[in-house]
Amino acid sequence: MSESVHTNTSLWSKGMKAVIVAQFLSAFGDNALLFATLALLKAQFYPEWSQPILQMVFVGAYILLAPFVGQVADSFAKGRVMMFANGLKLLGAASICFGINPFLGYTLVGVGAAAYSPAKYGILGELTTGSKLVKANGLMEASAIAAILLGSVAGGVLADWHVLVALAACALAYGGAVVANIYIPKLAARPGQSWNLINMTRSFLNACTSLWCNGETRFSLVGASLFWGAGVTLRFLLVLWVPVALGITDNATPTYLNAMVAIGIVVGAGAAAKLVTLETVSRCMPAGILIGVVVLIFSLQHELLPAYALLMLIGVLGGFFVVPLNALLQERGKKSVGAGNAIAVQNLGENSAMLLMLGIYSLAVMVGIPVVPIGIGFGALFALAITALWIWQRRH
């Protein structure tokens, strides 16, 4: 294991390979665990509106810890922070396996994920620089989405076989991620910062203000937040849409449909890495608008094959849209507030959007609005929101 403090800027350095492997296993566990736990809720006869609540407690951990996790990522070697965070995920998954309340166990996984995210993205700026940063983001997103593809399917398929087996597979994936983290080089950190919680909160709010007052980073924050809020809501919408629109009631089919989105995002992320630079980020905006349009069209489908094709298209558009926004925020944020703090602020925005959208979706399901009209309204509103963001960006 290398302990070098020097950065090897090669896109395929030993450290970068370890980051990608750890990211894949951790994201695999996250996505398999979601569908395995949803199957557990279904088996234990929880109400349908409680399904998005599961994700809400997960993202709630992100929001509550947002003022602190960025400084943690910047104050310690990011590879070690990632290892600790994956250990928390392992503990959360294991607790669900052993019969602890699934909402409590999933909250613990959320705490681990909150600590993990600033470190996993912040380390990219330490392992590579300049023009390779967008490509590194493309690799990171491709790894994550490949994990979403395989993890989602594995979670659903294994849960149809036996829920406990699915949960155990998630714990095993997190354990593998912990091992992979050991091989990430121990790069220089920024120790010596205050650990007073009030001061940390104030510092985080200052970072929020700094990024929000910069037009480029504000644009990136809003765009990425809208995308990920919509993405997680679509995932839960599919769980209810499949039996209504397609008449299929198993756990696996929604995961197959989610996998189509994942495949598309891998393609879109690769295209963005080749076609978009930090100077041409606005090229991604038409793709964002089209996401909403295609979601609207998708909601009206009643056949499986068109549903697969449209969801893959949504993924392609999504990958092309979000990868340049992530790279822009990391590059500008690293120079102003530190990479870890920049990603922590991004997480706050994204997870606040998720919490809001999931809350609205859960409320809509609770009051009895049919899932197809929910999907139509969701797609239309997303397209309008991205259009408004693009108009604002061009004017400023």
Swiss-Prot record:
Residues 1-17, 74-90, 166, 247-255, 301-303, 364-365 are periplasmic. The keyword RNA-binding does not apply. Its main location: membrane. Pfam families: MFS_1. Residues 39-52, 112-144, 188-225, 277-279, 325-342, 387-396 are cytoplasmic. It is found in: Cell inner membrane. Gene3D superfamilies: MFS general substrate transporter like domains. The chain crosses the membrane at residues 18-38, 53-73, 91-111, 145-165, 167-187, 226-246, 256-276, 280-300, 304-324, 343-363, 366-386. GO terms for molecular function: lysophospholipid:sodium symporter activity. GO terms for cellular component: plasma membrane. InterPro entries: LysoPLipid__transptr_LplT (IPR023727), MFS (IPR011701), MFS_trans_sf (IPR036259). It is a multi-pass membrane protein. It comes from the Bacteria. Keywords: Cell inner membrane, Cell membrane, Lipid transport, Membrane, Transmembrane, Transmembrane helix, Transport. NCBIfam families: PRK11195.1. Catalyzes the facilitated diffusion of 2-acyl-glycero-3-phosphoethanolamine (2-acyl-GPE) into the cell. HAMAP family: MFS_LplT. Belongs to the major facilitator superfamily. LplT (TC 2.A.1.42) family. This is Lysophospholipid transporter LplT. The gene is lplT.
